[in-house]
Amino acid sequence: MFSREENELLTRVGPGTAMGNLMRRYWIPALLSEEIPLPDCPPVRVRLLSEDLIAFRDSNGRVGLLDEHCSHRGTSLFYGRNEECGLRCIYHGWKYDVEGHVLDTPAEPADSDFKKKLRHTAYPCREVAGIVFTYMGPREKMPLFPAYEWVNLPDNRMHVVKAYLECNYLQGIEGDFDSSHTTFLHCSNLADLARLNRDGAPTLEAEASDYGMRAISIRQLGPDKSYVRISPFIMPAFSIVPGPATAKFEENDSRAFRFWIPIDDTSTWFYILTMRDTPFSAQERASARSWVDSRYFRIRNAGNNYLQDREHQKTRSYSGINAVIPAEQDGCATESMGPIYDRTQEHLGYSDKTIIALRRVLLQAAKSVQEGREPPHLVTDPKLNDFSRLRAVKGVLPANGSWRELPDLEEGMV
């Protein structure tokens, strides 16, 4: 049973918490590049790990992520003037650069060196794949940015979207490692009862790795073959899932790198970075965003009961939620648990094997930071910074075959 103390440890992410301190040791998404599209464009509010921040793009195109409140007397920098390579507070004109240096204090005497004694809270940023990443931990411990597959992928072979979730991040990411739910929640054809009977209870395995963990699910396709999916969990709250298999389990080369980023304890930004080996069309890109509005709120949400169609539920789909992508159905399942689910009330079975393993990995990592030890997957050696082969893997094997025999199981998965 998951204890109340363990639940608190994994779900609280503010400054000074065990999980919050852990997440701050990694490069994590802060916002999409498109939210601050041009030099000197209006700044935007960013709430991240229970901290209120302001993101802006300066005159040279550099991105800054600052504490929202001016170091002078606390006025919000959201209303500031973004000009001449800095963000200037509208109250007394204090001006900050992207690194938090105080460039100007015009209300102070001309000969004052007051500004040289100050440093506003600012977090380093890096833009990759249409996402602004930030590092919020100790500067002296800042790791290298991990060189995942998408770091050097052409823009036309990937697209990214984010969505707002009204629940704790852990509820969301646990769904990525709950293989058995896909048979039911995402079933779009009730007539396919054979499929429900065939793969409702997959064989599950979990294996620790230097980057976190990988989850393995094995479904029997008959007496002589099985379908295998291997999904990595990557510290601190990332996952990779393969593209959906067709009804005939044909190949689909798409894969999605997913980030579950806490806004605070009870809300989450969910980023989906989708990749494949051929370019995406403009129509495909538009469709991939059609389930969120201009603020990245989901069209189907708790306020409209996820637009569930009860008649459709009776006759067609298992959930009655006619989603553009499965994540919309996942949102209903995870948000309806409440803001932070009390895991002391759950009753876990075999189908939760990989979720239990995921929690164990996170607990060990959080406790490592509590005890002053380094958590896993902090990249510090440039020679070891190559994760381009780290992917989700899927394939069909003989019934008695091992998942380790999959041809795409590269060194990066180890």
Q: What are the functions of these language-model segments?
A:
Residues M1-R24:
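A boundary/linker detector
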Residues P15, P37-L38, R62, F133, ...:
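C-terminal catalytic domain of Rieske-type non-heme iron oxygenases
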Residues G16, L32-H159, A201-T203, I340, ...:
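Rieske [2Fe-2S] iron-sulfur-binding domain
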Residues R24, R119, R126-V128, S254, ...:
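A short, structural micro-pattern
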Residues Y26, L49-E51, T121, Y211, ...:
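Short beta-strand or tight-loop elements
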Residues I28-A30:
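Generic N-terminal leader segments that precede the first folded domain
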